[in-house]
Amino acid sequence: MKIIHIAMQAFTVVIFVYIAAVILSYSIMFVLAFWTLRKERSLDRRELDERFVDAFLSKPVSILVPAYNEETGVIATVHSLLNLDYPQTELLVIDDGSKDGTADVVISQFDMEKADKPADLQLATKAVKEIYRSRIHPNLWLIRKENGGKGDALNVGINFAKYSYFCTIDGDSILDEKSLLRVMKPIIMSDGKVIAAGGNVRIVNGMDVEYGAVSSVKLSGRPFVVMQIVEYLRAFLMGRIALSRYNLVLIISGAFSVFSKKPVIRAGGYNTTTIGEDMEMVVKLQRLLKEEKLGGRIEFVADPVCWTEAPQTMSVLRKQRRRWHQGLLESLWAHRKMAFNPKYGAVGMISVPYFWLIECLGPIIELAGYVYVIAAFFMGGIYYEYSVALMLLLVLYGTVFSMGAVLLESWSLGTFPKIRDVFRMMALTLTEVVWYRPLTLIWRVEGLIRSLFRISSWGDMERVGATGTKGAGK
């Protein structure tokens, strides 16, 4: 029994120190995000959009859409990209050996014919089978290739992209009309010093979508979906805005991001052996910037919005979250020499350690904390008091920061204009700590285990057509 008591006391210290570190980190990020959004809130976005349209004429963009079994949503995605308010783009849909009719619906919908396209084959990829070009939209291309994963599909897109900047969009995502214009703004303002920029990702489930554009913003009726919306707000509005302020970003979403092609090729393109290719690319670019003293920046931009379909069932959400966490560990492990290494500046001393200790390994400690609460409750005595205090701390950082993210979004961007939707999100955050967060912690730990045993598979995500026609995906 003495050993058990010593172990319980030791773990009490560990879990309380961990949660205190998390609360401190989140508090700092919340304050930084607030000040950044407060400054941007005073700007007239329409005036800025008009000012940058002419400047963008010299910055054409190749839009890459890797698609695997995206028959349900790819047409809406392409429509949204064709409707972008942007001076000069080319659109490349890369069909990564889909088993469904992804390529067929694109060919049929956009009246495509076989064509040749020049390529600069600097990145090794799986074989390209066929290339098609739209008769209706000459800037729209379809590239059919052997299956090689998302990273390989993006490398094919880079090889065939004719412009110096490329934008990556998931095959089930849609952009607002001004999104590409706004995500390119920091690149133009920095005269190319910003080599990559990522936009804000929102969940489209429950929205009304017509012709590739969100026509009516509505909050989904599914608690699973609403909790994911809150998670996205917390991750994007708090975490990435704060890290971006000091060039500490290690993740910009692969669902919507823009890169300068030259440094990406210099870094070797996308890693085709990891399932977290989007994060691995950003970490690799940060490493390149520091090792070669290039002085560039990677930024997150809060205003441009990309809408994407989220899982609506527990089984699909589980596959997604364990895949994300597996990709996180794989990316950090591939570049482990950066951790606590002053050679990489603040990225090595602050950002990489944060992702290792809080984001990657944190779920193990936090999940053990839930087990501790249950065990301490039944042990009684002083451990009962510890369990109550720990539960209050879990509620504090799990609920308060989620509510803060919802209020921050409502105040600064106002995606959900209806007050009842905002209150509903806040009400659900009160329940997060007792059902949703424990589940996601378990799935994230599963991702760590799968990474250790080198189990790599994406897992198919069911598409319900939330990006399809009006009213779909509710």
Residue ranges of each PLM-predicted region?
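Short aromatic/hydrophobic "clamp" motif used to bind/position activated sugar donors
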Residues: 166
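Cell-envelope/extracellular polymer assembly enzymes that use nucleotide-activated donors
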Residues: 59-62, 90, 265, 280
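Acidic donor-binding segment of Leloir-type glycosyltransferases
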Residues: 79-143, 188
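A short, conserved alpha-helix in the catalytic core of glycosyltransferases
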Residues: 263-266, 274-299
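Membrane-embedded multi-pass helical conduit in multi-pass membrane proteins
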Residues: 354-452
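Long helical/loop segments within the catalytic core of UDP-sugar-dependent glycosyltransferases
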Residues: 117-155, 159, 163, 177-274, ...
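N-terminal membrane-anchoring/stem segments of glycan-assembly enzymes
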Residues: 1-55, 240, 369-372, 404-408, ...
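N-terminal signal-anchor transmembrane helix
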Residues: 29-88
